[in-house]
C-alpha cells in the first residue's frame, strides 16, 4: 500500500519537485488505513479507508489504483492517489457593537499544521474602545501512537476597559491564561 500525490500540474506550468510530495506525513495516512499488507484485498476496506481519510477534511480527492504484482500473481498493489486541499487561511473581520465599539480582527489558521492533521491558529482582535485580545490555539485530533487520544490548548492575553471603574480605580483589566483539553475519540463506526 502506497500513497502518492495526484498530479495537478497544468501544461503551461513547470514541474516543481517540492509539489511532487504530499504535505501530509505518512503516519497520518497510515492510521486511517483499513487495507493491510498481506491480508485479502476487499472493496469495503478500500471504501472505509477513503471514507476515514475524507472525514479529516484535508483532502479534495482520493483515488485507489490497484495493480498486479510482477512477482506474485495473487498479490495486489494498492496505490492511493491523493489531492490535498489548501488548509491555510487568513481571515479579517470588522464589526461594530454598542458595548465594544468598532472591532477589527485578523486570524491565521492551518488545519493540517506541519502535515500532521493538527489545527493551529493565531488570532488578534482590537477595538477602538481599548479592548484587545491575542490568542494562540493548537489541537491534535489523534496524537501519534495512541488509540485516538486528542489534545489541545490555547494561550491568550486579553485587555479590556472597565467602564464601571471610578476615577481612582484601575481602568484596564488584563487577563492572561490558558485553556487545555484532552479527550478520547470514539471508534470509526460511531457516527
How should each PLM-predicted stretch be described?
Residues 1, 5, 83-86:
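Conserved catalytic cores of ATP-dependent inositol ring kinases
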Residues 2-13, 187-191:
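Short, intrinsically disordered, charge-balanced linker/junction segments flanking boundaries
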Residues 8-35:
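N-terminal periplasmic "start-of-domain" segments of outer-membrane beta-barrel proteins
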Residues 22-23, 39-191:
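Gram-negative/organellar outer-membrane beta-barrel architecture
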